[in-house]
């Protein structure tokens, strides 16, 4: 008997040693399930690597770890992501964005009519659903699901290129307020892209997983997700590894695009006051928008940033800009208020190849100016925060963790507003741009059976939950 036990013990030790050596020296298995964050403004894809427990957010062919959620239709092809972004100003009527706002959602004709004025492309009302009309060689009707499928196909191809193998399975995130039809429509979009969805996870839960909160002892988690076009605030109640969404609120028309617009309006006014005209060429407006986005990004780490754009002198306008894109809102800063930018004007004219005169508009934008232009918008972030606390019957001091999601939460003044409200610093240990995709990738690894084993996040459905919107 003793001899048999010795043999058995030796066999077990041999197996353990073989397993250890395999983990140390054999190539790690390739991830089989990808995690997708299909965002309103940007989308991304990631994988969880067995053995190391690391998440890799997969870049596109140019090194971008997220791509714009935009799809352009032309006579010859369909362009996605950054290629679509480049066509947005020259082909606006055929460049679809914000499709996530429409996917699977039921609209009354009046509700949809209130939305369509915000977009340069045609939005149609078909049997309670939104569809898009685009014109290439002919006019075609495309659904939000089809637009989403083109984005998902691009993400799938990025993952396949990186992993060097076909990908068929995915976990995908959706807003917590998505109903069953919106979730099923998102799955349908994935199916059109050749993906089988193993699980749909709520974005706030995914973010909490990225921060590791599914493995630590916290009870109440507030997730603030501020992206390019929307603000979502979710109150999560964590019990063990289970997450219950207690309350949701937000603003579907507040995000980084709005902050950009305030600065763009300010620059338009500077240009008009200096040169007496407003930029009207699509490519120059596009360059101005790109410059504004770059300024916003630079101001997250620097106190000031430069704008330098070559503009073609058009016919001089007889009056200052009124209404629309070129007007600085009346409640915003005006020259002489002590916060003016430090302008560097080059009034000397040069000639372009077309014979038109050109000027180089240069200016320095301070963080102080950017914050002042947007302070009222920054304060609006607190409104849905206060609402979820009210609906959750909680005081702000009872929140264990405040986590930030979305690129716009990088703005220092926004972090300061949140810190001042709660009296403590929000958790910023995870890249806010990648929080959701990181969490989804972790869940994809769990569903794919990767090791080391992770604690899965279980979501408790709350069928009575409704999101309060402040638009």
From Swiss-Prot:
It comes from the Eukaryota. The keyword Lipid metabolism does not apply. InterPro entries: ATPase_NBD, Heat_shock_70_CS, Hsp_70_fam, HSPA13. It is found in: Microsome; Endoplasmic reticulum. Residues 1-22 form the signal peptide. Keywords: ATP-binding, Endoplasmic reticulum, Microsome, Nucleotide-binding, Signal. Its main location: other. Pfam families: HSP70 (PF00012). One of its GO terms (cellular component) is endoplasmic reticulum. Residues 317-330 have a biased composition (Basic and acidic residues). Transmembrane segments: none annotated. Residues 317-350 are annotated as: Disordered. GO terms for molecular function: ATP binding; ATP-dependent protein folding chaperone. Belongs to the heat shock protein 70 family. Binds UBQLN2. Has peptide-independent ATPase activity. This is Heat shock 70 kDa protein 13. It comes from Mus musculus (Mouse). The lineage of its organism: Eukaryota, Metazoa, Chordata, Craniata, Vertebrata.
């Amino acid at each position: 008997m003793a001899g048999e036990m010795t043999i058995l013990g030796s066999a077990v030790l041999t197996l353990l040693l073989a397993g250890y050596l395999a983990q140390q020296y054999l190539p790690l298995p390739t991830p089989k399930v990808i995690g997708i964050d299909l965002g309103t403004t940007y989308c991304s894809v990631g994988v969880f690597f067995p053995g190391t427990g690391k998440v890799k957010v997969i870049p596109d062919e140019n090194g971008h770890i997220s791509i714009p959620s935009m799809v352009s239709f032309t006579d010859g092809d369909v362009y996605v992501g950054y290629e679509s972004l480049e066509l947005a100003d020259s082909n606006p009527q055929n460049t679809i964005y914000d499709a996530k706002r429409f996917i699977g959602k039921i609209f009354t004709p009046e509700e949809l009519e209130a939305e369509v004025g915000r977009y340069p492309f045609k939005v149609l009302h078909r049997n309670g659903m939104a569809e898009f009309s685009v014109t290439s060689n002919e006019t075609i009707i495309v659904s939000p699901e089809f637009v989403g499928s083109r984005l998902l196909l691009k993400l799938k191809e990025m993952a396949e290129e990186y992993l060097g193998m076909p990908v068929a399975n995915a976990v995908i995130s959706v807003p917590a307020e998505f109903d069953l039809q919106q979730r099923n429509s998102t799955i349908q979009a994935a199916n059109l892209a050749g993906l089988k969805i193993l699980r749909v996870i709520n974005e706030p839960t995914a973010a909490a997983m990225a921060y590791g909160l599914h493995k630590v002892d916290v009870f109440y988690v507030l997730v603030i997700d501020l992206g390019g076009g929307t603000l979502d605030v979710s109150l999560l109640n964590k019990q063990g590894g289970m997450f219950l969404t207690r309350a949701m609120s937000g603003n579907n028309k507040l995000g980084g695009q709005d902050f950009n617009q305030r600065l763009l309006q300010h620059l338009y006014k500077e240009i008009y006051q200096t040169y007496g005209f407003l930029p009207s060429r699509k490519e120059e407006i596009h360059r101005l928008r790109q410059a504004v986005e770059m300024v916003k990004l630079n101001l997250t780490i620097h106190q000031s940033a430069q704008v330098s754009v070559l503009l073609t002198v058009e016919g001089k306008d007889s009056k200052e800009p009124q209404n629309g894109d070129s007007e600085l809102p009346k409640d915003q800063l005006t020259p002489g208020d002590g916060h003016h930018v430090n302008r560097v004007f080059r009034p000397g004219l040069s000639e372009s190849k077309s014979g038109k005169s050109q000027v180089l508009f240069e200016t320095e934008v301070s963080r102080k100016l950017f914050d002042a232009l947007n302070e009222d918008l920054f304060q609006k972030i607190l409104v849905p925060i206060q609402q979820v606390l009210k609906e959750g019957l909680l005081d702000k001091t009872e929140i264990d963790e405040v986590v930030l999601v979305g690129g716009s939460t990088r703005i220092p003044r926004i972090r300061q507003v949140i810190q001042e409200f709660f009296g403590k610093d929000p958790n910023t240990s995870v890249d806010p741009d990648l929080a959701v995709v990181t969490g989804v990738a972790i869940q994809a690894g769990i569903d794919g059976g990767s090791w080391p084993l992770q604690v899965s996040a279980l979501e408790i459905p709350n069928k009575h939950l409704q999101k309060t919107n402040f638009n």
